[in-house]
């Protein structure tokens, strides 16, 4: 087993997750089996109770693990499926050690950070690195480990010490360290500054770890003189200083690393068994990146939510939209609409915000209401859903978005004016969305219906069923405490509001569709968590196809061809450039 530790310096949030994912991608393209571990030095057991404003979205895994959004990057880049133990937190380690102490496993010894906490970290990493994450169920050969935060943080000290010991335990030829550092370029001088990187590397060395590769995050490519300066003062060869400058798309980062000889360095440093053969996987990434830069037609989606000021709150949703837009060769424009600004009360309080929000919504090609929690902004989301239904605008509701679509229909089509979710109005006379029996209201963490669950399609004419490939069931990831009230189901279906997907027992409503609407779909699960750059999520793909006016032609062709082949229902034909791009992508996919 080979271990690659990715650490960061100067500031957090400079792209360690993307770099770690990109390293894994180029190694996987060489035929190696790669896994990934993310270490978060916070005391929380998991990310389940985080505010989206605090830490971005909570990513959900197949086993129900609520983890850091970086694990979403690993899964998307590497096309793997991780488990909750691939996200290691200080809370998990301390909980494990304390439980052992309570059981008497330490035989009366004084339990300390060194050696007990550090040993537990090393054991966890070695154990988890062996768990297969690919579909072929083969034990990984390389484990990429990302240490969150920055070197020198008091929270990460036990982990740094653990890896200082770990490098000797597994031997030098099986362990290397990538250090990601910022090279700022002040606008006043325009000169790239190396001092922060020098100080960061010095601090890392003082803690017992020496970087094998220094990856420099910068806005523009590094000058040779700057690279030589970092090489000299940080005691590494010039080839070990890698420039990771800003690029047009994150999908170009693996190509950027490949061009600078990172694979060759790993071959020599870790004695990796890499064959000298064409890398078809990277060829796909290059084609995808090139195509994303050439897109001309644009499609706009209004994302109506309550966390719109912080894009990381909807990281996977945005990625799923990007994957689908790229699949139909359209440039994506996401219009963030704060749902609270759509509420009638805003017309009196802040009319400018109110009109701007409605202008964004009405000028969009499609509307998406993603998941969320809490009552704030829910009435605005219902207003947006009402407009999408009446104006026959393509709509996708995810989790809470589906539940609010049920509320909107009940209020306006069933004349249940007080219809609501018991989450927001426990005393409503028409509880169309109710608390699930297994939900424990006295505890917040880990009390939801989580992880991969099966959804059975009950209707063969379902649009979503066709988009999934005309299958009988799908398995997608869930994260919710409330569900549609099954006792009221028949009232909706009499009015053309169909529950076309249910759980295995037939008790929980999973998918809704509406008759006489080009695309009005709601899903209780979160399809964005399983979307991949080359395999977009079907519900999101359907939204983009409908928004671009291509859904009907795609469905008429049996959903077997690339969606880019579906001519526009609005214009009647596709451009020759798109047809050429389609032909190229299909030839690569067939390889």
Swiss-Prot record:
<comment type="similarity">
    <text>Belongs to the CTP synthase family.</text>
</comment>
<dbReference type="GO" id="GO:0005737">
    <property type="term" value="C:cytoplasm"/>
</dbReference>
<dbReference type="GO" id="GO:0042802">
    <property type="term" value="F:identical protein binding"/>
</dbReference>
<keyword id="KW-0547">Nucleotide-binding</keyword>
<dbReference type="GO" id="GO:0003883">
    <property type="term" value="F:CTP synthase activity"/>
</dbReference>
<dbReference type="GO" id="GO:0019856">
    <property type="term" value="P:pyrimidine nucleobase biosynthetic process"/>
</dbReference>
<comment type="pathway">
    <text>Pyrimidine metabolism; CTP biosynthesis via de novo pathway; CTP from UDP: step 2/2.</text>
</comment>
<keyword id="KW-0436">Ligase</keyword>
<dbReference type="InterPro" id="IPR027417">
    <property type="entry name" value="P-loop_NTPase"/>
</dbReference>
<keyword id="KW-0067">ATP-binding</keyword>
<dbReference type="Pfam" id="PF00117">
    <property type="entry name" value="GATase"/>
</dbReference>
<feature type="active site" description="For GATase activity">
    <location>
        <position position="399"/>
    </location>
</feature>
<dbReference type="InterPro" id="IPR017926">
    <property type="entry name" value="GATASE"/>
</dbReference>
<dbReference type="GO" id="GO:0005524">
    <property type="term" value="F:ATP binding"/>
</dbReference>
<feature type="active site" description="For GATase activity">
    <location>
        <position position="528"/>
    </location>
</feature>
<dbReference type="InterPro" id="IPR033828">
    <property type="entry name" value="GATase1_CTP_Synthase"/>
</dbReference>
<keyword id="KW-0315">Glutamine amidotransferase</keyword>
<feature type="domain" description="Glutamine amidotransferase type-1">
    <location>
        <begin position="300"/>
        <end position="554"/>
    </location>
</feature>
<feature type="modified residue" description="Phosphoserine">
    <location>
        <position position="571"/>
    </location>
</feature>
<keyword id="KW-0597">Phosphoprotein</keyword>
<dbReference type="InterPro" id="IPR017456">
    <property type="entry name" value="CTP_synthase_N"/>
</dbReference>
<feature type="active site" description="For GATase activity">
    <location>
        <position position="526"/>
    </location>
</feature>
<keyword id="KW-0665">Pyrimidine biosynthesis</keyword>
<dbReference type="GO" id="GO:0044210">
    <property type="term" value="P:'de novo' CTP biosynthetic process"/>
</dbReference>
<dbReference type="GO" id="GO:0006241">
    <property type="term" value="P:CTP biosynthetic process"/>
</dbReference>
<dbReference type="GO" id="GO:0030903">
    <property type="term" value="P:notochord development"/>
</dbReference>
<feature type="modified residue" description="Phosphoserine">
    <location>
        <position position="575"/>
    </location>
</feature>
<dbReference type="Pfam" id="PF06418">
    <property type="entry name" value="CTP_synth_N"/>
</dbReference>
<protein>
    <recommendedName>
        <fullName>CTP synthase 1</fullName>
        <ecNumber>6.3.4.2</ecNumber>
    </recommendedName>
</protein>
<dbReference type="InterPro" id="IPR029062">
    <property type="entry name" value="Class_I_gatase-like"/>
</dbReference>
<dbReference type="GO" id="GO:0097268">
    <property type="term" value="C:cytoophidium"/>
</dbReference>
<comment type="function">
    <text>This enzyme is involved in the de novo synthesis of CTP, a precursor of DNA, RNA and phospholipids. Catalyzes the ATP-dependent amination of UTP to CTP with either L-glutamine or ammonia as a source of nitrogen.</text>
</comment>
<dbReference type="InterPro" id="IPR004468">
    <property type="entry name" value="CTP_synthase"/>
</dbReference>
């Amino acid at each position: 087993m080979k271990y690659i530790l990715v650490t960061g310096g100067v500031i957090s949030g400079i792209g360690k997750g993307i770099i770690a994912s990109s390293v894994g991608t180029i190694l996987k393209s060489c035929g190696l089996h790669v896994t990934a571990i993310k270490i978060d030095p916070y005391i929380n057991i998991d990310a389940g109770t985080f505010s989206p404003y605090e830490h971005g979205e909570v990513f959900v895994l197949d086993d129900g693990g609520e983890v850091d959004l970086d694990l979403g990057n690993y899964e998307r880049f590497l096309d793997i499926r991780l488990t909750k133990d691939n996200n290691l937190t200080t809370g998990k380690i301390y909980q494990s050690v304390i439980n052992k102490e309570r059981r008497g496993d330490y035989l009366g010894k004084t339990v300390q950070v060194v050696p007990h906490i550090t040993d537990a970290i090393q054991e966890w990493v070695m154990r988890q690195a062996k768990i297969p994450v690919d579909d072929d169920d083969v034990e990984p050969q390389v484990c990429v480990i990302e240490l969150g935060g920055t070197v020198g943080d008091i929270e990460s000290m036990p982990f740094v010490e653990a890896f200082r010991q770990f490098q000797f335990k597994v031997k030098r030829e099986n362990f290397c360290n990538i250090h990601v550092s910022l090279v700022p370029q002040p606008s006043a001088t325009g000169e790239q500054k190396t001092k922060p990187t020098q100080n960061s590397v010095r601090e890392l060395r003082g803690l017992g770890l020496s970087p094998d590769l220094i990856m420099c995050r910068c806005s523009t490519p590094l000058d040779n003189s700057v690279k030589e300066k970092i090489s000299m003062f940080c005691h590494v060869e010039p080839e070990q200083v890698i420039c990771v400058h800003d690029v047009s798309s994150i999908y170009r980062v693996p190509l950027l690393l490949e061009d600078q000889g990172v694979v060759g360095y790993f071959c020599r440093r870790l004695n990796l068994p890499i064959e000298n053969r064409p890398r078809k996987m990277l060829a796909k990434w290059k084609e995808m990146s090139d195509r994303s830069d050439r897109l001309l037609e644009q499609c706009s989606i209004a994302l109506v939510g309550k966390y719109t000021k912080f894009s990381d709150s909807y990281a996977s949703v945005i990625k799923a939209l990007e994957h689908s837009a790229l699949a139909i060769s359209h440039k994506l424009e996401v219009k963030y609409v704060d749902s609270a600004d759509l509420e009638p009360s805003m017309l009196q309080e802040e009319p400018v915000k109110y009109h701007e929000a409605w202008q964004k919504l009405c000028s969009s090609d499609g509307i998406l209401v993603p998941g969320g929690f809490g009552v704030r902004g829910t009435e605005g989301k219902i207003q947006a859903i009402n407009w999408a239904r009446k104006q026959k605008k393509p709509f996708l509701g995810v989790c809470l978005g589906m539940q609010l679509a049920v509320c909107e229909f009940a209020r306006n089509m069933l004349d249940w004016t007080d219809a609501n979710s018991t989450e927001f109005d426990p005393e409503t006379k028409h509880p169309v969305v109710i608390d699930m029996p297994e939900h424990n209201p006295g505890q917040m963490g880990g009390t939801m219906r989580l992880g991969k669950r099966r959804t059975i399609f009950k209707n063969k004419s379902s649009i979503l069923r066709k988009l999934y490939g005309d299958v009988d069931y799908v398995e997608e990831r869930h994260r919710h405490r409330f569900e549609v009230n099954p006792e009221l189901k028949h009232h909706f279906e009499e009015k053309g509001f169909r529950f076309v997907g249910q759980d295995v027992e037939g008790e929980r409503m999973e998918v809704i569709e509406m008759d006489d609407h080009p695309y009005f779909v709601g899903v209780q699960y979160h399809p964005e968590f399983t979307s991949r750059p080359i395999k977009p999520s079907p519900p999101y793909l359907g939204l983009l196809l409908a928004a671009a006016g291509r859904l009907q032609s795609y469905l008429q062709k049996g959903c077997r061809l690339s969606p880019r082949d579906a001519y526009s229902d609005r214009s009647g034909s596709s451009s020759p450039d798109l047809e050429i791009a389609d032909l190229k992508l299909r030839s690569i996919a067939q390889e």
